[in-house]
Every structure is written in structure tokens, then in C-alpha cells.
């Protein structure tokens, strides 16, 4: 107990070991779905799901432990939703890069992220990007996740006449996905910890009876991480065509992680004078996790908004995060269960997360068309072009153009002009490629 007090200063934060552990378990239950969802998504890129499962558990444990031990923050880290889908379905699936090259792009973005954090530029860059575009990025990624979820569940299918259409609702996967989604929403309404995780497990169990899935056991030694460990192709990622991808990874990581860290830390009462040094340490731990995750073999790692659940349960120190880290390490031994989770079992989780992300629409300034229109353009272009980068590009270009032609150019930060110019040059030079 004395060691824990010395490490985490529990009394100074008005908490105790029991409260911190309960908070850690609460946070873990709200985000444990990622150990099933991330391998499922990255498998679509051709990555070995067993190795990705191990990489997911390890980076979640290592990143969260560093957040707890180094920054003494009750915030958990894991591979982020949205960028994993962009990695698999766009960078690899649509653009044709290998997953090794895509990991190289994540590595480079992680190095950039680490550099701007070390030099104190992270907050400066974030403040230079319009709030409307920061908000729209979250909304657009939510819509992007939604269409992926509906496709994975078989609810939406391709159509030569209308691009997309309704799938066959009589198929068992569609029905099971719908049941899983309703279950998640109902459990969330009643504030049941681990609602998303329960939904995934429930649909997986149903798949054994109605989907032809086969139970492969529950516990086993962790699979090998060798197929993904240090398999990144950095030289391939340095080629001109993929630099656009690096920029997307970098920008989304920047806004998502920084916003989450600030939001959760503020709720925990940690963003006050005298405690900002710890926030800077949290930024560094978060940045290092992206770098490390690419080496292990997973898409970008980020701070999880679900950490707010642990803060709500009383978590105030890094002991909460360390508890989460230990639980992620324990998950290494349930690989047989993770290996039989079908895509239509994780689809309800994706769709629910997408629904939650759309609430950010209320943050847009609907009284100023020069703010709301670029935001909406950003959000809409992501799912409709099936590419997060295109949404960002059209959003920044539209924002700069509208401000310029309405006499509000002075309102635009220099960082926004630079990003808009980069995207415009890319479109002029490469078109829609």
C-alpha cells in the first residue's frame, strides 16, 4: 500500500486503492470490445488476426501502463476506432498499398506526432485548426464507421443501379447484428458496464447456434506476434503517393487524442495550474504509443474517451490506468474466443460507436455558413468517397475558399492555409487518385 501511495499519491487526489481498481475495471469493460473489433477490421487488410489480437492487447497494456506510471493519469490507450477502418478499407483495400506499407505510414505519423509533442507544438497546431473542422472530423469518421458496420452486417449491399441498397433481411447474420445493436443500446441506456462487450459476446454465442460458427475454446497460450512484429515497410511509406495517408493519420491522431486527453483530464480535475506538467507527460505517453503500436503491428493508438467512465467511478490517478493495463494483459489468454468473433458480431459495436460520434454535430455553429458548410462537407465526403482523406481535403479547401471570398480571410489561421494549400496541390497534381 505504501508503494502505491508513493507512486500515485492517492491521498493527495482524495482517492484510495479500492476506488481506483473499481474505476480501472469500469474503464476496461467499456473499451474491451477493441480486442475483438480491431483484429476483425485489420483482417480485412490481410493482416493475421491472431497476431493483431496480441498486438492490440500488448499496445493497450503498454500504452495505458505508461500513461499511469509516467503521467499518473487515469486514462487508457488502445488502437483507435476510425483510423483502423481507414487503414484496412481505404489505404490497403481501395488504394492498394500493402499492410506493411500502411504500418510504415503509421510509424512516420507517430514519429511526427512524437516530435511535435517534444517540441511543444502540439497544442499550437490544434489551436490553429478551426473548431468546425475538428468537430466535423469526428462526425465524418462516425459516418464512415456506420457504412462499414452496415456493410459488415449485410444490411447494406452494393447495387449497380443505386450504388448501395438494402440487403437480404432474412439472412441470420443480419438479424443477429440487429439484435446485438438493440441490446447494446438498451444496456447503455441502463448504464450497464461493458454494454458493447456484452453485445459482441452475445452475438458471437448466437452465431454458434444460428450462424454455423464453431466454438474453439476459451483459454489458450497467446498466439505468436511474429507475423506482424517489426513488419512495417518504412521505405514504401516514404514514397510520394502515400504521404497523403501519413497526413491523414497525423491530423486525426492529433485532434482525436488531444481532444480526448483534455476532455477526460478536465473532468477528473487535472487541468489546473500546478498540474499541467502531468498533462504534458500524458501527451508524450500518448505519442509514444502510436510509435510503439506500429512496431507491434497495429494501426494508430489513441486515448479512449471511454476513460471518462472510470473517472466517473472515482478514478483520479494512474492506478486506474495500471489496472486497465493488467486486464488487457490478461486478455492475451482468451485468443480462441477472439478468433471466432464474426464480422457481424462487431458490426453492432461499430454502428453504436458511430451513433455516439454523430452527437458532435451539435457543436457546429449553425448560424455561420462559412463555418457549418465546410464542416458538413468534411463529414459527408468521408463516407460518400469512402475515404477520410478526401473529407479532410474538401473540408479544408472549402473552409479557406469561403473565408477568402466572404472577406473573412483574416480569421483563418496560417496552419489552415498551409493544409488547404497542400490538399489543393494534391488534387491539381494527382486528381482524385
Report residues per predicted region.
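Loop-to-helix transition at the N-terminal end of transmembrane alpha-helices
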Residues: 46-62
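Juxtamembrane transmembrane-helix boundary signature
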Residues: 60-81, 112
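Hydrophobic/aromatic residues within the transmembrane alpha-helices of Major Facilitator Superfamily
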Residues: 25-32, 62-65, 69, 150, ...
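Membrane-embedded alpha-helical modules
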Residues: 95-209, 322-433
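Residue-level signature of catalytic and energy-coupling elements of molecular machines
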Residues: 21, 41, 125, 194, ...
